[in-house]
Amino acid sequence: MWWFQQGLSFLPSALVIWTFATFIFSYITAITLHHVDPALPYISDTGTIPPERCLFGVMLNIAAVLGIATMYVRYKQVHALNPEENLIIKLNKAGLVLGILSCLGLSLVANFQKSTLFIVHVCGAVLAFSMGSFYMFVQTILSYQMQPKIHSKQVFWVRLLLVIWCGVSALSMMTCSSILYSSDFGPDVVQKLHWNPEDKGYVLHLVTTAAEWSMSFSFFGFFLTYIRDFQKITLRVEANLHGLTLYDTVPCPVNNERTPLLSRDFQ
């Protein structure tokens, strides 16, 4: 049995691979058509102009769905492992809410480009990155609370390092972007897709975009740490029938149907 066939480990793997492919495919398309510069554009800039905008939107929406699925499985796993720990239960619920909000922001980024509705696009990006960062932080606290009985110390330290990486990237991005957009670097700096080294604010732009890419890769690394955990969990779906027909009838007891969530049982 391959490693990705064990439990639900394919979920975080698919999330990372699919999201990375989204960024790479839209980047290659935008570069090939000369819609952006090769040197570190904003991630969303590679999905601003058709046809890469269509590709970016569709693929990023699917990534958001994969993200919610991954976070929900993580929520169910932590809940099953700690059914009576009040602190862990509260943190686990908070983590799920933060994760869903982050995925909502990701979907907003996918569907509202900065060239059309800039405010909505920025709100989506802030939601995705900020809630995603807090989600990582909460999950790291959960890892600390559950080690060494359930989680190994190594997993906690790896996740802590990834959270620190994410925090440094976020701080760099916020600082440089605030200076870039609040200073007098021209009226089109917000919508600008092509930058030259002699342009005002070029260095700030590069640092901001580099921090954005760096932050995204810290997310990738964090979700990859879920693979080993997800090898030890499966989910099932249960159909409860209220009658023997689909007409309006008096409810009668019938046998419930139970099948694996994905039509096969990974053991």
UniProtKB/Swiss-Prot annotation:
Transmembrane segments: 8-28, 53-73, 87-107, 118-138, 160-180, 203-223
Gene Ontology BP annotations: apoptotic process; autophagy; cell population proliferation; phloem or xylem histogenesis; photoreceptor cell maintenance; regulation of autophagy; retina development in camera-type eye; visual perception
Tissue distribution of the protein: Expressed in the retina.
Domain of life: Eukaryota
Alphabetized UniProt keyword annotations: Apoptosis, Autophagy, Cell membrane, Lysosome, Membrane, Transmembrane, Transmembrane helix
Keyword Cell membrane attributed: yes
Major subcellular location class: membrane
A Pfam family that the UniProt record links to this protein: Frag1
InterPro entries from the UniProt entry: DRAM/TMEM150_Autophagy_Mod, Frag1/DRAM/Sfk1
Cellular component aspect of the GO annotation: apical plasma membrane; Golgi apparatus; lysosomal membrane; lysosome; photoreceptor inner segment
Annotated localization: Lysosome membrane; Photoreceptor inner segment; Apical cell membrane
Keyword Transmembrane helix found: yes
Membrane topology, as annotated: Multi-pass membrane protein
Function description: Plays a role in the initiation of autophagy. In the retina, might be involved in the process of photoreceptor cells renewal and recycling to preserve visual function. Induces apoptotic cell death when coexpressed with DRAM1.
Family: Belongs to the DRAM/TMEM150 family.
Protein name per Swiss-Prot or TrEMBL: DNA damage-regulated autophagy modulator protein 2
Organism: Mus musculus (Mouse)
Name of encoding gene: Dram2
